[in-house]
Amino acid sequence: MDEAEVIRLIRALPGVVVVTAGPDTAAPEVAWGDSFAFYDPDDAGEAARRFPFATVVTKDYPGFDTESRLGRPGVFRLNLPAGRERFTRLFGFPPADLGDRRAEFAFDALDRLVPHPVYGRQGWVSVVAPGPATEREVRELLAHAHERARQRYERRGGAAADDRDDASW
């Protein structure tokens, strides 16, 4: 799967808005070119888009997130929140234990599901250059993350219940 295909897959989910950061968004310049998927069935805009349920990152963030080596041609990373329970089923240990288990993972491996190099302790997972080896799992995790985002949205009473001014970035 290439980046455009992954974004099309995400956009096909009901109630989803995908924002690609750029000069016309509130995103910091370092995030320009990266895409963020939000469950926003009312298309209420930035106020409703606090936390993405999926991100597609196209470059390393120097000094913060470089372990995936995203500077390689055509390489990007899909990030998804699996949650503690699913993360534990996937990797055999809870997200809180990732600090002690980091050496077990090649965060720059292509087409392999790994804990997110920065947000793994919060239950996020990632795949650098998803392809045939991870496609089924990516689709399942994407559906899982989308459903969790939908449930969170419903619990909060939809976009109207969330009137804070802070941006989702």
Residue ranges of each PLM-predicted region?
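Charge-dense, helix-prone N-terminal extensions
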Residues: 1-169
